[in-house]
């Protein structure tokens, strides 16, 4: 199982739901750096006891999931929340509604995996991925499908690179 290899693992969607009935075993199996990416429905299946923690406070809920699982958690939504193992948390508020379509989460996961492969640490990779995901979706506008988002990302990255703050 990938979770026992000692290698960084990125899990999302069905890779999480498969553990719905054995969540506690799943948490115990995570022995290496792990990133979990989910929306509320997937989150509720993997962390059923955290649904209404503290009146539904998203930060409390996601911090609880990170502590319980030992994974960096990204909970997708209108305000995407990322929580690190040390409790640091950020909310990304630039998630336009056109991101709520099939395949878009796969693009986010792949973007984050790419950042991780380049040496970015999980918390920063999650937040950078979520932010760029939102910017690219906003740039494209309505009618977005996964392929459109992939095609929009290079121009967003070029735009950032051309800014003085990102120059060498």
What role is predicted for each listed range?
Residues 8, 106, 117-118, 155, ...:
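Short, well-ordered loop/turn and helix-capping segments at boundaries between secondary-structure elements
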Residues 53, 132-135:
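A short structural micro-motif
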Residues 116-129, 137-143:
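Phosphate-handling active-site elements
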Residues 1-94, 162, 166-168:
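Glycine-rich phosphate/dinucleotide-binding loop and adjoining beta-alpha-beta core of small-molecule
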Residues 96-112, 122-123, 142:
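Short glycine/threonine-rich catalytic loop with a Thr-x-Gly-x-Asp
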Residues 60, 90, 109-110, 151:
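Feature representing long, continuous alpha-helical segments
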Residues 134-168:
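Charged C-terminal helix
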